[in-house]
Amino acid sequence: MLGGCTTTTEGGVVGADRKQLMLISSEQLNQMAAESYAKLKADSAAKGVLNTDRALLHRIHAIAARIEPQTGVFRQDAPGWEWEVNVISSNTLNAFCMPGGKIMFYSGLVAQLHLTDDEIAIVMGHEISHALREHSREQVSQAIAAKQVLDLLGLDQNTSGVAAFGYENFIATKFSRTDESEADRMGLELSARAGYDPRAGVTLWHKMMEASKGSGRPPEFLSTHPAEENRVREIESLLPKVMPLYEAAKRGK
């Protein structure tokens, strides 16, 4: 285990440099994520739902190929990660990026919300930003810290559960408002630098809010990424900073 506070990213126009408590190494969590991702792929392949929509897979791969090189703005090591991009055919409205760059999109998110390439890029940039900031590692560290306090008080009867952290945990992780704000900001910048219109962040979240209306159970993506008006307002406030990056990318600069 590692102890202490650090920041996982730096630089960028709207990046984040908040200090984070980390009590588990990146290598440990990345290995866990890689194993979980491999199991998810195997389970999905066995069900015949992995990468069956070749057109959508090609589309998602093309967008990822433009965004991944931009991650070096925030982390010099990130472009060299062992990136993976796959698509599960499912009506589920979800997408995520596990630690270390393991990306998964569900076809329902794109099909049911009729996402444009710009909107897909916003989703992808947001999810990648969670991985860049190592929000999952931070959450595990907070759980470890809480257990250590309970141990000192003699109140905890359970194990830490870190070893049992499976892909269901990575998929269903509910990040804090601070985490979500950081991912929104950095995701906008990543997509803009890759030549995708950051204004799509506004249309995307309006679509998300519409999808959540009249539903007794919110879509999977919204259960972990709540769509709120103030979230849209924050994105709108960032557009003057990231639009020049998009315009420069479109000019090929």
Language model regions located:
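A Zn2+-metalloprotease active-site environment signal
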Residues: 3-253
